[in-house]
Design a protein with these regions (language model features):
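Structural core segment of the AMP-binding/adenylate-forming
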Residues: 9-82
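Structural motif detector for alpha-helix initiation sites
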Residues: 78-81, 101, 124
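Conserved pre-ATP/AMP-binding loop-to-beta segment of ANL
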Residues: 88-109, 116, 141-147
Length: 167
């Protein structure tokens, strides 16, 4: 959730991926969307991606939540602790992004059960529309302090609605 919102506030487009993807699936997805930054949760996920990262010049930074022991691309690598210890420079502060409702917010890929995964672009307005409808439907179910429990990954479009509904 934090990464998703931070990327959107930086005027970026998020591309959540299933943790169950194989290296081949990740290679396809990365080639298709050509991200400049990849955020990885742990060493296990990093191991699935490290060969792909080394081969792609369009990947400028790799950010990990856990410190990775062996990294072949030190000039691209940042761990979350090193990012949070730095003071924000003026250029890092949030600016007016002039986003439109039809501006892309994220690309969600299908699970690829019928072939290669297909990327679907969700706009900021589309997410807002889903959120407004979901909040209206959920009104009778929500008390003063709702608790949400979901098993959906962020790479599922409904999870985007649920994560923002909590805010």
């Amino acid at each position: 959730l934090i990464s998703d919102i931070a990327i959107m506030l930086a005027n970026g487009i998020t591309v959540p991926a299933y943790t169950t993807y194989t290296e081949k699936d990740y290679k396809y997805l990365i080639e298709d969307c050509q991200p400049s930054v990849i955020i990885v949760s742990n060493d296990e996920m990093h191991n699935k991606l490290k060969n792909i990262i080394n081969e792609r010049s369009f990947i400028k930074k790799v950010i990990t939540f856990e410190k990775i022991k062996k990294v072949d691309y030190k000039n691209k690598y940042l761990d979350f602790d090193s990012i949070t210890k730095n003071d924000l420079q003026e250029s890092d502060k949030i600016k007016n992004l002039n986003l439109k409702r039809n501006s892309p917010a994220c690309i969600i890929y299908t699970s690829g059960t019928g072939g290669d995964p297909k990327g679907v672009i969700l706009s900021h307005g589309g997410i807002l529309n889903n959120l407004e409808g979901a909040c209206e439907i959920m009104k009778p179910l929500i008390d003063k302090r709702p608790i949400f429990l979901t098993w959906l990954p962020l790479s599922h479009s409904y999870e985007h609605t649920v994560q923002f509904a909590q805010i």
